[in-house]
Amino acid sequence: MSEPAGPVSRCLIALGSNLGDRLDNVRAGVAGIEAAGIDVVAVSPLYETAPVGGPENQGPYLNAALLADTTRAAADVLALLHRLEASRERQRVVHWGPRTLDLDLLVYGELVSEAAALEVPHPRMHERRFVMVPVCDIAPDLVHPRLGRTMRDLLADLPVEPGDLTRLTDTWLTDTRHGATHDHP
């Protein structure tokens, strides 16, 4: 007899890649999340963004966000995301350095945790347009659990910098053309 499922929690996950086949990497992130039995409710359009922080001369990122429902505990979701990153040979060597796959648990239901092992909501998500623009494409009215404001309102507070985000495609999960998502060493 299997254990009963826990309550369903809605979570937001950010996806990014700026090494290797970036499109394949972010697609693999979504596929891995779905294969783990997490119900992906919505996926944002795909954006190309300049790297923020970290070493100079990094290639641009592909960024997206997804909204999902899960009965897994938050720590289990985070562990899954780390395993998926490792499966794409993500190396955690340089802070804000280039990465094959970056998966961040942004929001997990109403949970607020500042533990070193599990910090949700993500402490800097509301400061980053490359996170908030894709999030607002799929969950503009979601309320930030710690700040008590909608994602739309948090995005409105951020300054717009010309060229910081380029919307590439809404159909990136199914589109077989790479277009502007070419590989980066």
Regions found by a protein language model. Name each.
Residues 1-11, 75-80, 84:
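Short N-terminal secondary-structure initiator segments
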Residues 2-38, 44-50:
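N-terminal beta1-alpha1 ligand-phosphate binding loop
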Residues 37, 46, 52-61, 75-185:
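Flexible, gly/pro- and Lys/Arg-enriched active-site loops
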Residues 66:
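Short basic (Lys/Arg) and small-residue
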Residues 70-73:
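Helix N-cap motif at beta-to-alpha junctions
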